[in-house]
Amino acid sequence: KTLAELHPEWVFPSFSAALMYGLWVPYSRLNPIRICAPNAPYRRRSKHLWVSRLTPTDVHLEGEANVTGLCQTLLESALDAPVHLALPTIDSALRYLLISREDLLEYAQREGYRRRGIGRARAAFAHADGESENGGESMVRGIIIELGFMPPTMLQAELPDPLNQGHVYRVDMLWELDDGRCVIGEVDGA
């Protein structure tokens, strides 16, 4: 916010914009702060600041900062990170009902042509799920996908307690296997 006050002409893209939207952003993506400065003499990267000439297609005022539009924010985040680091941000946008997965895929098709990382971004959009309850669950699901394992068939599944009729257990991830067995994945406790 301080940078936005000092430089009102700057536009914040990618994970920096996602943070302003209140989306889940992995800690490792908080730095460097990303900035679009169309008048910047060149693309500059440092440990704390990443300035590019990227021209935002859609700019919104979020709080007191200019940020890229939500679709561009999510696309830039997904282009800029592996699936497991992009999924928390995308999942939270879906969870908060800010956008649909179909709109994201359509935007990626239209705006992502020939962009570096577009295949990875499309994969993140295709696997995004607003049922994820926190960024940790999203990251674990992303790692499972990146490693080539079958993604969960259901998130936040409710299972009956066989010993206590009427009581249910809720699990973070559920895999329903072809042979009828189920595998449960729990990220943050029981």
Feature locations, PLM:
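Surface segments flanking catalytic/ligand-binding clefts of nucleic-acid enzymes
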Residues: L94-A190
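Short gly/ser-rich loop at a beta-strand->alpha-helix junction or flexible surface loop bordering the NTP-binding
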Residues: K1-G117
